[in-house]
Amino acid sequence: MTARILCRAVFLDAGGVIVLPDRNLVAGALARIGVAIDADAVSRAHYRAVRGFGRAGASNPTYVRTFLAELGVAPERTEEAVVAIAELGDRARSGVVLWSELTSGAVATIASIRRAGLRVVIVTNSDGHAEENLAACGFAGVPVIDSEVVGSAKPDPRIFEAALHRAGAGIKPADVVHVGDTLAADIAGARAAGITPIHFDPLRLCRARDHRHVRALSGLWRHLTASS
């Protein structure tokens, strides 16, 4: 059995780890341009699409094209669909938060981590609106480090340095685990910052044996022990 990690803080990616694209918003936006999808395939499409990218989001056209392909959108409709998703992801235009569907156990797991006395910081490559968007999803009061706000993005270690500062005095990289769903941004970035990464991989798509994996956030407790 893998030894548990003695830690004082847990960093979490946002998109793909605690929130996903809302399946009904995605299906509705595509339906408005005459493209039908299976809404229940949205989460699976995300995890398949994000494997090769450092950042997922409506503002990342390469990710969105792969996401749409995984949803079965025909190639000849792709560019139109990319525009539809980009518009949906712009809260100022759409009036909704695209990344607002909670992953299973997200709220309960974060609550249990905090009850155990561990600090929690959300570390996300985003557009400057992550904190307000996540607050609307039920995460008000959880510290958020947004790449656009701090001026560095995963895998740059500086974004993790900002998160360490936010976590509080005395928190060192060795005291922290970071949970993320991308190899390039989350796993490599955490390692570069001296932080132990845990790969959030619900579909078991990653076969690498050089880092830890969880399929659900509730599984984190198999890897962690709270340090006083």
Model-derived segments and spans:
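Asp-based, Mg2+/Mn2+-dependent phosphohydrolase catalytic module
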Residues: 1-17, 73, 107, 111-114, ...
